[in-house]
A protein has these predicted regions:
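S-adenosylmethionine
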Residues: 1-275
């Protein structure tokens, strides 16, 4: 895979001796995986389970297969499955998935809620919100409301309401380069900083929707520190937050200057990229 020169230089500086293995990992095939839907099926079992996950398996499921069409399984990349697993809501919670389409994290959050509590799955894009609705309906989650709003408009309605907010933020998408090579066309040295400005705007609205004692889980599918550790540090500096350490499993490594956070690289883990 051919990378922009600025990308290579950046990750040689960040990863040092690991940079060669990191860049070489992009020549491998993207990893496919899926989850069993515990709301519908508890008897299905497959080989090649993703370690340390309750419902995840490596492998590809056809969109035309009976298991997919009936919502018994949901296709989701392995690293992406870690976000809702870190969030892990308990039944009865009021949960917001703020950038939810196409529905991977929302279906997983709904699995943890097990029909008890409320999940608001929001997607600002009208087109993508329709896909989100289809996936949530197929999954069979009954305690979910799908909204098609900006974070700013939601914040006017849900001030101090949610026990848990998950934001898998719009980002530069570096972690998806292997799966979606076209995403590299949008990348530039300045692009992560541009994304970070939007991320701060969304987070400022998210903070107002958290109930007292609530939790905010922030994630991206990129490795750019501008969009990850620097955003977390901005939250800590700007608001009354306490950073909860993440258990580093499945090849996770500590974040840059924030060891409580976690990074996932394809040369450490059988999956794509995630923060």
């Amino acid at each position: 895979m051919q990378f922009p020169e600025g990308f290579i230089k950046k990750y040689e500086e960040i990863l040092g001796d690991e940079a060669r293995a990191f860049l070489a990992s992009f020549d491998d095939e993207a990893v496919s995986a899926f989850r069993i839907n515990p709301l519908k099926e508890r008897q299905l079992s497959f080989s090649d389970a993703i370690p340390n996950t309750p419902w995840g398996y490596y492998g590809k499921v056809s969109g035309k297969s009976p298991e997919h069409v009936t919502g018994l399984v949901y296709s989701q990349e392995p690293a992406a499955q870690m976000v809702a697993q870190v969030a892990q809501p308990i039944p009865g919670m009021k949960v917001l998935d703020l950038a939810a389409a196409p529905g991977g994290k929302s279906t997983q959050l709904a699995s943890y809620l097990a029909g008890d509590g409320l999940l608001v799955s929001n997607e600002i894009s009208s087109k993508r919100s329709k896909i989100l609705v289809e996936n949530m309906e197929r999954f069979g989650a009954t305690n979910v409301v799908v909204t098609n709003e900006s974070a700013e408009r939601l914040a006017k309605v849900f001030k101090g309401y949610f026990d848990l907010i998950v934001l898998d933020a719009p980002c530069s998408g570096e972690g998806m380069f292997r799966k979606q090579p076209d995403a590299m066309d949008y990348w530039s040295v300045d692009y992560p900083s541009q994304c970070a400005s939007l991320q701060r705007e969304i987070l400022a609205d998210a903070v107002t929707m958290l109930a007292d004692g609530g939790r905010l889980v922030y994630s991206t599918c990129t490795w750019a520190p501008e969009e990850n550790e620097e955003i977390v540090q901005w939250l800590l500096d700007s608001y009354d937050f306490e950073l909860i350490p993440i258990q580093h499993i499945n090849g996770m490594v500590p974040g840059i200057d924030l060891p409580e956070t976690a990074r996932m690289y394809p040369h450490h883990f059988k999956g794509e990229g995630q923060f």
